[in-house]
Amino acid sequence: MKKEVRKVRIALASPEKIRSWSYGEVEKPETINYRTLKPERDGLFDERIFGPIKDYECACGKYKRQRFEGKVCERCGVEVTKSIVRRYRMGHIELATPAAHIWFVKDVPSKIGTLLDLSATELEQVLYFSKYIVLDPKGAILNGVPVEKRQLLTDEEYRELRYGKQETYPLPPGVDALVKDGEEVVKGQELAPGVVSRLDGVALYRFPRRVRVEYVKKERAGLRLPLAAWVEKEAYKPGEILAELPEPYLFRAEEEGVVELKELEEGAFLVLRREDEPVATYFLPVGMTPLVVHGEIVEKGQPLAEAKGLLRMPRQVRAAQVEAEEEGETVYLTLFLEWTEPKDYRVQPHMNVVVPEGARVEAGDKIVAAIDPEEEVIAEAEGVVHLHEPASILVVKARVYPFEDDVEVSTGDRVAPGDVLADGGKVKSDVYGRVEVDLVRNVVRVVESYDIDARMGAEAIQQLLKELDLEALEKELLEEMKHPSRARRAKARKRLEVVRAFLDSGNRPEWMILEAVPVLPPDLRPMVQVDGGRFATSDLNDLYRRLINRNNRLKKLLAQGAPEIIIRNEKRMLQEAVDALLDNGRRGAPVTNPGSDRPLRSLTDILSGKQGRFRQNLLGKRVDYSGRSVIVVGPQLKLHQCGLPKRMALELFKPFLLKKMEEKGIAPNVKAARRMLERQRDIKDEVWDALEEVIHGKVVLLNRAPTLHRLGIQAFQPVLVEGQSIQLHPLVCEAFNADFDGDQMAVHVPLSSFAQAEARIQMLSAHNLLSPASGEPLAKPSRDIILGLYYITQVRKEKKGAGLEFATPEEALAAHERGEVALNAPIKVAGRETSVGRLKYVFANPDEALLAVAHGIVDLQDVVTVRYMGKRLETSPGRILFARIVAEAVEDEKVAWELIQLDVPQEKNSLKDLVYQAFLRLGMEKTARLLDALKYYGFTFSTTSGITIGIDDAVIPEEKKQYLEEADRKLLQIEQAYEMGFLTDRERYDQILQLWTETTEKVTQAVFKNFEENYPFNPLYVMAQSGARGNPQQIRQLCGLRGLMQKPSGETFEVPVRSSFREGLTVLEYFISSHGARKGGADTALRTADSGYLTRKLVDVTHEIVVREADCGTTNYISVPLFQPDEVTRSLRLRKRADIEAGLYGRVLAREVEVLGVRLEEGRYLSMDDVHLLIKAAEAGEIQEVPVRSPLTCQTRYGVCQKCYGYDLSMARPVSIGEAVGIVAAQSIGEPGTQLTMRTFHTGGVAGAADITQGLPRVIELFEARRPKAKAVISEIDGVVRIEETEEKLSVFVESEGFSKEYKLPKEARLLVKDGDYVEAGQPLTRGAIDPHQLLEAKGPEAVERYLVEEIQKVYRAQGVKLHDKHIEIVVRQMMKYVEVTDPGDSRLLEGQVLEKWDVEALNERLIAEGKTPVAWKPLLMGVTKSALSTKSWLSAASFQNTTHVLTEAAIAGKKDELIGLKENVILGRLIPAGTGSDFVRFTQVVDQKTLKAIEEARKEAVEAKERPAARRGVKREQPGKQA
């Protein structure tokens, strides 16, 4: 058994779910190999992932045929199966870093933003890597304020928090710093000449350009001094005194050798060498002067130096140790000396200093690193490094802690206040920060910074979403809902709705971030070879390719450990690639096709819009067994027939024909039959005969686009015709809005017998005679048919002898013989009005009269006397002929004569009434026959009448000249009055327009009077009078004058066009006329689009409204008023007959009504006769309004009941259950939309007067519940009006007991009330359109419903469109379907939440039953667009508009579509739950008498069994299988 879908749910997919759908990961961007044309491995078309390209064949061809089904080839890894799997097997791309789903980011309001309380801009800054978001602040403080979770940080702020506050000061080349590297500085201190620190902190050098190494030199040297002069010490510091000599002293050589003198800045060394080996080294302190020179040979005992006064150590040399040997009066000192020798090294930009300031180095240590090893600086000896000339100085906010012993932290550690740094706990940090240990200076620096966790990109957002505790957030927001501020409550409600959507649906917020991207099956994004060997591919493949390329590049960069900035950029590009795939162009510029500017179609584009999946492929599809061709008129056809070209029928009915050919033996089998048909020339006559048999009894559907209402598709019995054109019955043209100037129509064949039966019963053209919009005939005589019938039923009126009086008939006849009196001239005989024809030709029966016409004795238009059914009729043979035609068609002469009015010619309206009355009295079949008869004779007589138009038929009346002269005189007077200042410019303009309007009217009357009196059979006049073609305005322009014309702005030219078309226009007149004509053309084009869109919106809002039950049982009703206030006097007057009919016809009476002695019972369907009775009663003052059931008050959910809806207007009988009345309503309102004007009338620059919206824009404004531009001020309370006037403004007070309401108005406001008037709430005080929302607040829903129906009807009536009120009521009901919660009571609802009235009412019933507080609500008025988008069915809403928004909301809430309306069922390919698809029809069984009897017996038996005593029932056992 086929499974039936009952509900459809949409939800978010988790990363695991996406991977579970996938058959493998797509790792490469390749599609197919350009040489072998086979899919690349791991690419977007890989057969291992998506399945084989050929049925039951692996990629390498090892396994072929079905017997290997399910086997995976060990060579190529492809599963042997059908290739169709490539339409539904998905792959996936594993993202290197998570990416956000753009729908949940860019939706308004953003779903992710709402959950995390981030604005759209903030969210975007994080996702696209321009700001960090804080995941864990770890106590961080920024500018004295604690950092909070989810706070956004700029790059600078993040660096300051993470790495400390720091400022960089660049130094020019060659300038040395005034502070040392690592020195503490204060704000305002000079760091280098002209460079001042703006921060307290530690100065750190960046890129020193010069390094000075102070190498440590050591030497052991001797010195003999007088013992008495020696200042004895164990060691000497630089500059200390060695000896105080009272008299000069000579220092002598104690060995012989060659002198080597090494001079220092102060002091010197003297080395004696023998054979290049040093034999003695002497130290010459400051105060001792050498007496020998370098290279001199000295003897033992020779003086080397002379000393005087104080001998001291040089400033740069110290003696670390002294050994003294006393010899008599002298002492020999052995000094262990140390001193430094500085050496500078330049550091080039490509070199890098690797040791800090003040560091000690050993010989061989590297000081400066370089790319080229030869450029590196290596320590020559032990020494201390000093840095100079930094490129910049970095001042870091840090605390410096000196220490003595051990350090307990190491560089890079993070510490908090109170953490131990050194000296066994004596030194502790008092800030958060990062440690830098400086062993040179014995300090620990703590750079003030925080171990803050802040990140960028979707990764950060995903983490935050994962951490969300939705339950806690819900509680927090519920508390926020109690806040006094309305704005705060509204914001909390929006967030709460999203939070609850996640909680109730079981979706997780982090699923809005993608870790893996699903890859669409390849056959849904195909790549095909086009002519010339090139490939055409779906845009999706390009988008996937970009994504894979970027993903792979990011993976590679991450593996290589690329710098953060490069990774960040690549991640951003990956996010953008995911965005482009999901919804190209939603953010930033769209990705375009290389080589053109066309944006690529992303997944969103494939779904949404007119060309999207929903509207293009699901709501409507192209079908097989269809064709189209040009239409031509088929006057010989019956109403239910159409002419189908033979060749077309051959193709459309091919399968049936092939079977028939095989059955009849024309061809041995189907294959031969098909070949026979393909060879066009070989088609034999018996094939055509077989085709005739095949189509016998079948119907086809004809459709003309645009299909504005259901009569745009009708069923016809095909009749085979020669040629290539479809022949259409002339009387269905009106329903199709077809004409024969090149229109085309489509043909469809219903295939199954069910479809054939449904088309024949429901859709046959002969079964659709009345309009579903108004109940008036749609199939009615028109154009030539009217002309022909009018021609034969018109009577001649002749002037000759008119008005003469005769004593006897004989005298009159004699005068006629003499030629004094015309046959049809009105005369009096013995005081009775008659004519010669009536006296001369008296026929015993109608047949005689027609015989006289046939013999040329009388004309069809002459008035004669005929006896019929015992009555003496004075009428024309033409009218008798017409009655005969009708009688023959309906096969009932008595009824025919009753239906026809014999005293008037048959024009458009009387023919329409005839058809309608025939339908009511005789039914559908006979009416169809009548229509065919009228068609046949109408064409016949319009042909034989020879009516044609010539230029001379446009007769200009003689009075025109004098009327124009008169107008010119009055014009002069107006101009003079203006010149003299008696009129303002505006008054002058208005009076001139008034004058010309009156003149035009006079000329029009003159034109028609002239025709009527002098040319009654003038073709122009006949056409206009009969309603066949043309209207009085057109005739006026042909024969009278064109009149006033419109300016492009919409105002009127004050200069009229005086000429008629017959006379011809002057150049100026032609020019003036052109504006209006052009505006008309432009209007039509705009109107068509707007009207179509309105229809679509109406269908979307009403499609679920179906007649679902017989009676909803409501006691509510609406009262249809029979009177209305006059526009000018405001006094009540009876409404127009047509308006009352549109409000009452076909409705069910809600209360019993007794009028004019007739009792109309409650529950009665009001026929047209009943309506006319009620109108008569209203005229007699017996009744003011009629209580009727209405869709507005119906209690049926998702539809209406039979009683509240009333008649199915197209059948003039109560509506059937299952009828899709919502769509009928939408089509009925939308279809005439193109006939409405587009005009916005301009008031011509009057100050303060706004434009009055009319026509289609007004209808749209009302259905969209927009606030009108020129708004009327309405009273909010009942009370008495008091008006106060000041210099600047008007004040209108409405006063009721103890309460007054003031309305301040501009001075030029046009009031509708005067002092002392009593007004009700909702009544307008000024002119203008009422704002329906204000009316709803002031007067409640019933007033708004009435207002909307009445205002919409006004626009349609103005254009002469007939439309039943109930169609508008159905739409208005959908607009009033929603309510807003004002107090949630004890429910889970939220204040301000909008939901359907039904839901709230059902909830309240439950709450009251449980003894809880019910929900308080107020009614809402919603425009049709908003109402359609708010529908519970997400499928319907998504296929209407804003697809992404609807799907986003639905997915988050995990919405289920219950498939109640029509659209959602069409989308799923199910039968629609209306008409024959409704459960009521599908599960209703038709039973015969025998079955009925069996059911009745079984029922009786069941009742008896119940009534038997319990004991007996226990004993008797049912026989198995015998069940009632």
Swiss-Prot record:
InterPro entries per the UniProt record, alphabetical: DNA-dir_RpoC_beta_prime, DNA-dir_RpoC_beta_prime_bact, RNA_pol_asu, RNA_pol_N, RNA_pol_Rpb1_1, RNA_pol_Rpb1_3, RNA_pol_Rpb1_3_sf, RNA_pol_Rpb1_4
Enzyme Commission number: 2.7.7.6
GO terms of biological process kind: DNA-templated transcription
HAMAP family, sorted: RNApol_bact_RpoC
Similarity remark: Belongs to the RNA polymerase beta' chain family.
Residues annotated for Zn(2+) 1 binding in this entry: 58, 60, 73, 76
Binding site for Zn(2+) 2: 1112, 1194, 1201, 1204
Superkingdom: Bacteria
Keyword Secreted appears in the UniProt entry: no
Gene Ontology terms for molecular function: DNA binding; DNA-directed RNA polymerase activity; magnesium ion binding; zinc ion binding
Enzyme class: transferase
Gene3D superfamilies: 1.10.132.30, 1.10.150.390, 1.10.1790.20, 1.10.40.90, 2.40.40.20, 2.40.50.100, 6.10.250.1410, Molybdopterin biosynthesis moea protein, domain 2
Binding positions (Mg(2+)): 739, 741, 743
UniProt-recorded name of the protein: DNA-directed RNA polymerase subunit beta'
Entry keyword set: DNA-directed RNA polymerase, Magnesium, Metal-binding, Nucleotidyltransferase, Transcription, Transferase, Zinc
SUPFAM superfamilies from the UniProt entry: beta and beta-prime subunits of DNA dependent RNA-polymerase (SSF64484)
Keyword presence, Zinc: yes
Function: DNA-dependent RNA polymerase catalyzes the transcription of DNA into RNA using the four ribonucleoside triphosphates as substrates.
Subunit composition and interactions: The RNAP catalytic core consists of 2 alpha, 1 beta, 1 beta' and 1 omega subunit. When a sigma factor is associated with the core the holoenzyme is formed, which can initiate transcription.
Taxonomic lineage from the root: Bacteria, Thermotogati, Deinococcota, Deinococci, Thermales
Location of the region described as Disordered in the Swiss-Prot/TrEMBL record: 1500-1524
One Pfam short name: RNA_pol_Rpb1_4
Gene Ontology CC terms: DNA-directed RNA polymerase complex
Details of cofactor binding: Binds 1 Mg(2+) ion per subunit.
Cofactor(s) needed: Mg(2+); Zn(2+)
